[in-house]
C-alpha cells in the first residue's frame, strides 16, 4: 500500500513528467496567466527563436498592473513605459494566438481575480503566472505560484516548468472567527506568527474549521498572501463550496464532464497520517482585527495594541531593521494604533477587490461620510466585479459617502500606474504589501481588512471595527 500523501504531494505526482537523480523535476503546467509587466521579454524570446506558444488554449492574457483606473482611461496611458508594455501584450497575444482581455473588455481585471471568475482556475491544476500573488489560485486546491520572465518563456514554449519539490507545511486555524474578524486578519496573523521567511522552501496547506468556514473569496484572500509568509504556494483542499463556485463559470466543465471532474476533485484531500515537515496551529477565536505598523507584512498587531518598541528585540539585526521601519513609517513606540491618523484609504487589489469585500465595505459606510482629511478610493478587482457592485447599488453608497469609485485594475497596490501615494502620505490599504515605496515613493502603508479600511476612512484614523456603529 502506498504511503499517505498530502494534497501537495498528489497534485505534484499527477503533473510530474520527469525527475533527475539530483531532484530536479519537469512539471506539466495546466494553466498559464500572462500580464503586461513580465511577459514582453518572454514573447520576444519566442519570436527570436521562431517558436510558437505550445498551448494557447491554456494561456490567458490580461492587462492589470499599468492600466489607469480613472474614468477617462479610454483616452490612453500617459506614462510611456506603461503604455508600451500594454501595447506589447496586445500585439503579442494577437501574434501568438492567445486570448486577451483589453482594458475595454468587461472581463478585464486583476489577473488573479479574472482567472477564478472565468473558470480558468480549477482544482488539481498547476497554474503559473509571472506574478508572485499567483498563490491566490491555491484556494481552489490548485498548485499555483509565481514564476520569473525566463520561466514565462519556457512555459509558453513547452507547457512545462523545471522545479524542485518543496517541503510540506500545514497551517491549521482551529475554531471559528469572532464577529468582524476576517480572512485578511487570519492571514496577517499567520504571517505575524511565522514571519516573512517562515514558509520558505515549503508549500503551505491551510486547514482547520476557520478555513473551511470561509467563502471561496475569503479563501482566495488567505492564499493570496502565502508569498508574504515566505512560501511560493498555498493550498486549500476543494469542497462543496469550491464546486458550487465553479459551476456555471464560462470556462468550467459542464454537464457530465463537470460530474467527472468533481469526482476527481473530491480525491484532492490530504490522506490520514500524511507527513508535514512543519505544523503551525492558530486559534481563530482569539484573533482580533489586525493592522500592520511597519514596512513588512510580519509587522502586525491588534488594532487595540500599541506600536511596539524595537529595543525589546534581542536580535541586533532585527532590532535595527524595526527601528528603520518605525522611522520610515513616522511612528513612535507606544503610540496607540487607534491614534494613528490617515491621509489616504485604498480598497481593492487581488487580495480584497472582490464583490464580498465591497459588500462588507458598503455595510460599514452606508449613510456615513469619509473624513474631510482623507482621500478614499475603491477599485473593483475586475469589470465583472464592478458590474455586479453597480447592479447591487453599492457604487451609489460609496459615492454618497465620498469614496472615489474607479475602473478595475491593480491600482494603488503598487506604484506602477497613476494611483500612488505622495511622499509622507499614510494609507490604510486592503492590499498585500507594505514595503518601503510599494504604494509610492516614501508612502506609508498599513495593511488591513476591507471593513477596517472603510471604518478608518470615515473616522480619519484606525478604529476597532468590533466597536463600530
UniProtKB/Swiss-Prot annotation:
<keyword id="KW-0479">Metal-binding</keyword>
<keyword id="KW-0100">Branched-chain amino acid biosynthesis</keyword>
<protein>
    <recommendedName>
        <fullName>3-isopropylmalate dehydratase large subunit</fullName>
        <ecNumber>4.2.1.33</ecNumber>
    </recommendedName>
</protein>
<keyword id="KW-0028">Amino-acid biosynthesis</keyword>
<dbReference type="InterPro" id="IPR015931">
    <property type="entry name" value="Acnase/IPM_dHydase_lsu_aba_1/3"/>
</dbReference>
<keyword id="KW-0408">Iron</keyword>
<dbReference type="GO" id="GO:0046872">
    <property type="term" value="F:metal ion binding"/>
</dbReference>
<dbReference type="InterPro" id="IPR033941">
    <property type="entry name" value="IPMI_cat"/>
</dbReference>
<dbReference type="InterPro" id="IPR018136">
    <property type="entry name" value="Aconitase_4Fe-4S_BS"/>
</dbReference>
<comment type="similarity">
    <text>Belongs to the aconitase/IPM isomerase family. LeuC type 1 subfamily.</text>
</comment>
<feature type="binding site">
    <location>
        <position position="413"/>
    </location>
    <ligand>
        <name>[4Fe-4S] cluster</name>
    </ligand>
</feature>
<keyword id="KW-0456">Lyase</keyword>
<keyword id="KW-0411">Iron-sulfur</keyword>
<dbReference type="Pfam" id="PF00330">
    <property type="entry name" value="Aconitase"/>
</dbReference>
<dbReference type="GO" id="GO:0009098">
    <property type="term" value="P:L-leucine biosynthetic process"/>
</dbReference>
<dbReference type="InterPro" id="IPR004430">
    <property type="entry name" value="3-IsopropMal_deHydase_lsu"/>
</dbReference>
<dbReference type="GO" id="GO:0051539">
    <property type="term" value="F:4 iron, 4 sulfur cluster binding"/>
</dbReference>
<keyword id="KW-0004">4Fe-4S</keyword>
<comment type="pathway">
    <text>Amino-acid biosynthesis; L-leucine biosynthesis; L-leucine from 3-methyl-2-oxobutanoate: step 2/4.</text>
</comment>
<feature type="binding site">
    <location>
        <position position="410"/>
    </location>
    <ligand>
        <name>[4Fe-4S] cluster</name>
    </ligand>
</feature>
<keyword id="KW-0432">Leucine biosynthesis</keyword>
<dbReference type="GO" id="GO:0003861">
    <property type="term" value="F:3-isopropylmalate dehydratase activity"/>
</dbReference>
<dbReference type="InterPro" id="IPR001030">
    <property type="entry name" value="Acoase/IPM_deHydtase_lsu_aba"/>
</dbReference>
<comment type="function">
    <text>Catalyzes the isomerization between 2-isopropylmalate and 3-isopropylmalate, via the formation of 2-isopropylmaleate.</text>
</comment>
<comment type="subunit">
    <text>Heterodimer of LeuC and LeuD.</text>
</comment>
<dbReference type="InterPro" id="IPR050067">
    <property type="entry name" value="IPM_dehydratase_rel_enz"/>
</dbReference>
<feature type="binding site">
    <location>
        <position position="350"/>
    </location>
    <ligand>
        <name>[4Fe-4S] cluster</name>
    </ligand>
</feature>
<dbReference type="InterPro" id="IPR036008">
    <property type="entry name" value="Aconitase_4Fe-4S_dom"/>
</dbReference>
Amino acid at each position: 500500500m502506498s504511503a499517505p500523501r498530502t494534497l501537495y504531494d498528489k497534485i505534484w505526482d499527477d503533473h510530474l513528467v520527469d525527475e533527475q537523480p539530483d531532484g530536479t523535476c519537469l512539471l506539466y503546467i495546466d494553466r498559464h496567466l500572462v500580464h503586461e509587466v513580465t511577459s514582453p521579454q518572454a514573447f520576444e524570446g519566442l519570436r527570436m527563436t521562431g517558436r510558437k506558444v505550445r498551448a494557447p488554449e491554456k494561456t490567458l492574457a490580461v492587462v492589470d498592473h499599468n492600466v489607469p483606473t480613472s474614468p477617462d482611461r479610454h483616452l490612453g496611458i500617459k506614462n510611456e513605459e506603461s503604455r508600451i508594455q500594454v501595447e506589447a501584450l496586445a500585439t503579442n497575444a494577437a501574434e501568438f494566438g492567445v486570448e486577451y482581455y483589453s482594458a475595454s473588455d468587461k472581463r478585464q481585471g486583476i489577473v488573479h481575480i479574472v482567472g477564478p471568475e472565468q473558470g480558468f482556475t480549477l482544482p488539481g491544476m498547476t497554474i503559473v503566472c509571472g506574478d508572485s500573488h499567483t498563490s491566490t489560485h491555491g484556494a481552489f486546491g490548485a498548485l499555483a505560484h509565481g514564476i520569473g520572465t525566463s520561466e514565462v518563456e519556457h512555459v509558453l514554449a513547452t507547457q512545462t516548468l523545471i522545479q524542485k519539490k518543496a517541503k510540506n507545511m500545514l497551517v491549521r486555524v482551529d475554531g471559528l472567527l469572532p464577529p468582524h474578524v476576517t480572512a485578511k486578519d487570519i492571514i496577517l496573523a499567520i504571517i505575524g506568527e511565522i514571519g516573512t521567511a517562515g514558509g520558505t522552501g515549503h508549500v503551505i496547506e491551510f486547514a482547520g474549521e476557520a478555513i473551511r468556514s470561509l467563502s471561496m473569496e475569503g479563501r482566495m484572500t488567505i492564499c493570496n498572501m502565502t508569498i508574504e509568509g515566505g512560501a511560493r504556494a498555498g493550498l486549500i483542499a476543494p469542497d462543496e463550496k469550491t464546486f458550487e463556485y465553479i459551476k456555471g463559470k464560462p470556462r468550467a466543465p459542464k454537464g457530465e464532464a463537470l460530474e467527472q471532474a468533481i469526482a476527481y476533485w473530491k480525491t484532492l484531500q490530504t490522506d490520514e497520517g500524511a507527513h508535514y515537515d512543519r505544523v503551525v496551529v492558530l486559534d481563530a477565536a482569539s484573533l482580533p482585527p489586525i493592522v500592520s505598523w511597519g514596512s513588512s507584512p510580519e509587522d502586525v498587531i491588534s488594532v487595540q495594541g500599541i506600536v511596539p518598541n524595537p529595543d525589546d528585540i534581542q536580535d541586533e539585526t532585527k532590532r535595527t531593521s524595526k527601528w528603520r521601519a518605525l522611522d520610515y513609517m513616522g511612528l513612535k513606540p507606544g503610540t496607540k494604533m487607534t491614534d494613528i491618523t490617515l491621509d489616504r484609504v485604498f480598497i481593492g487589489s487581488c487580495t480584497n477587490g472582490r464583490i464580498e469585500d465591497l459588500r462588507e465595505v458598503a455595510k460599514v459606510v452606508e449613510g456615513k461620510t469619509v473624513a474631510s482629511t482623507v482621500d478614499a478610493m475603491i477599485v473593483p478587482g475586475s469589470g465583472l466585479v464592478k458590474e455586479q457592485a453597480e447592479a447591487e447599488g453599492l457604487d451609489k453608497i460609496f459615492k454618497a459617502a465620498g469614496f472615489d469609485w474607479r475602473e478595475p485594475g491593480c491600482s494603488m497596490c503598487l506604484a506602477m500606474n497613476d494611483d500612488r501615494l505622495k511622499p509622507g502620505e499614510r494609507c490604510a490599504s486592503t492590499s498585500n504589501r507594505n514595503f518601503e515605496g510599494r504604494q509610492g515613493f516614501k508612502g506609508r502603508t498599513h495593511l488591513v481588512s476591507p471593513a477596517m479600511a472603510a471604518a478608518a476612512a470615515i473616522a480619519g484614523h484606525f478604529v476597532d471595527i468590533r466597536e463600530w456603529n
